Amino acid sequence: MEAGKLDYNEHFHWGRFEWMHAHSFLDEDKLTRIVLFKDENGAIVGLITYDTSYDDRGYLIHTSSEKSLLERMIETVLESEGLGAVMKVNAKDAVLCRMLREKGFEKKHKCGSVLSLDLSNSLEYDMPDAYTMSPRGFAADPWQYQLAIHKGFDNDGIPEKWEDAFLKRIPHGNEDLKTFAIAHNEYCAHCGLWYTTGDTAYVEPVATVPEHRKRGLAKAAVYEACTRAKALGAKRAIVLSDQEFYFRIGFALSSEAYAWGKEDSADFD
């Protein structure tokens, strides 16, 4: 979590790491490819990881920009991936970007945008008459929660139910920071948010069930979640997205992550 306080790590918030370990799509057979780096005192100072699918790999997260540490991290990826290695790095990570360039890597393409919302701004919202916002202390129904996410991200059919232990595997999840717009006992929109301490809260991409869109529910769900994080000490909220919706409700570009590789490297996103 200390890594999350550094702006060059904001494209891979700790919430992504916790969520992937609970996700049913996690490539569990690749978990041994995750590498931790420790300093002489045993503190974790570096992480090489992927996000849920091993195809989305090459994230280098670090709390120290010492050359020796970054050298070890780069060499570890090269030993695993060979010359086809791709590393996903925030443009704010000036030291790591410079070292990659010196080693013959090139910036390939953008692989993520981080948007930021200043929580000192107004977070007021309106709810249509037919809808209510889930209160603090709300015990979400797991099936309704799953349906809201499934439909809200435009998936067809009926999903296979999550295992009972699914959400229990997330150690720092805060149920009060999950918000739902509800009508007639149906969860119509949902925003999940991750926060423990520090300045930054992490917003999951908001989901609205198609037949309930264009009613301000997504904005309401995001603003309510951010209001609750602000009350706990957060000063800003970030989301990994470049959708116009977030700009319309006050988010602004904070940083971008790029894939770095050599001429013969793979071109995975």
Residue map of PLM features:
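Acyl-donor-binding surface of acyltransferase catalytic domains
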Residues: D51-D129, A257-E263
